[in-house]
Amino acid sequence: MRRLTRAVLAVALSIPAGAVGQAAERLSGDATRKVFEGNTVSGRYSGNNLPFSEFHHPDGRASGHNRNVANTDACWITTADAVCYYYGPTETRRTYCFTVELSGRLYVLRSRPSGRINGVATIEPGDPHGFSAGAAQWTCDGLISRAPGRSRLARR
């Protein structure tokens, strides 16, 4: 099954950006939040084909891994038209935002503002890999604290 998934992702990543854009439905930030929240987003990055898999906690944390490196402070939030992730303490924080397009069962993540495909993912219901059970605990501040209706800090 993993070989099939890798083959599907490899084909999806090889499609020219214009072709994917025409066949895909761009999701609003609210639609993206509804799909991602409480679920695991798993896929591969374009360019290097390295994996990512993150469980999106309702409180703004993203536990799991990027490029096989465990998340220790990852947070996520949606804007009007994108999903944004931030990593690290305030003084050295790295922020990445992506528009999300649905093409069949695949979610195409495009870097903002360039529009380049950053990765292709699928949604796994819930937390099938148990990322939240073994994750270190952290709080999400900054972007998440200023989001409408999302002022609650991650706790546990």
Stretch-by-stretch model annotation:
Residues 18-73, 85-156:
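Lipid interaction determinants
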Residues 1-8:
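Bacterial N-terminal signal peptides that target proteins for export
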